[in-house]
A protein has these predicted regions:
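Short beta-to-alpha transition helix within the HATPase_c
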Residues: 52-64
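Detector for a conserved hydrophobic position within an alpha-helical segment of the HATPase_c
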Residues: 163-164
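Short conserved segment of the HATPase_c
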Residues: 131-142
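Short beta-strand/loop element within the Bergerat-fold HATPase_c
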Residues: 110-121
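Conserved micro-motifs of the catalytic ATP-binding
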Residues: 42-47, 84-88
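Short alpha-helical segment of the dimerization/phosphotransfer core of two-component systems
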Residues: 20-27
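Conserved catalytic submotifs in the C-terminal HATPase_c
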Residues: 49, 74-84
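Short helix-loop "hinge" at the ATP-lid/N-box region of the Bergerat-fold HATPase_c
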Residues: 103-104
Length: 166
């Protein structure tokens, strides 16, 4: 990043530096996702506690508010009940943030996200981006229904792995 501030760089050199920086960010994100999946597969998240996912979801939804507002995406939460679960808090956060990101990334500008919380489930629905996901493959690692820049194709695989632990 400091190199990009160098005024002596040509436009071409700056462009190459920016590409390299984006590639490094992608590789870092991919590495973190694969490490998380490996830890989940190896059962390394043993510390659990009673969590109320309604509050946790709203807390992380607030973090995404500006991003959703930027694309004019309306988010509605219907709370039919409180969702209590005993699980690892880090995994709960990873699950919810992956689902929130996915609902945003695979949505259209001016779209909607509907989140329905019951005693035993949380359902995410969005208006979509015009490209339906293949139901047989959406939880496969590296599957991407439509290639999104910076996407690793691991978000729903992580969410699926976390849910299978419960």
């Amino acid at each position: 990043e400091m190199l990009m501030d160098d005024d002596s760089l040509s436009e071409n050199q700056l462009g190459e530096l920016m590409k390299t920086h984006q590639t490094l960010e992608y590789i870092t994100k991919l590495n973190k996702s694969l490490l998380l999946l490996t830890k989940i597969d190896n059962g390394q998240f043993t510390d659990t506690k009673d969590l109320e996912l309604n509050t946790l979801l709203k807390q992380y939804l607030e973090d995404y508010k500006e991003v959703y507002d930027y694309r004019n995406i309306e988010v509605n939460i219907t709370e039919q009940d409180r969702f209590h679960i005993v699980m690892n808090e880090s995994l709960a956060v990873a699950l919810l943030t992956n689902l929130l990101k996915n609902a945003f990334v695979h949505n259209m500008d001016g779209g909607r996200i509907q989140i329905i919380i019951t005693k035993n489930s949380i359902t995410f629905r969005n208006s979509g981006s015009g490209h339906p996901l293949d139901e047989e493959h959406i939880f496969e690692r590296f599957y991407q229904g439509s290639k999104k820049e910076g996407s690793t194709g691991l978000g729903l695989a992580i969410a699926d792995s976390i849910c299978r632990l419960q």
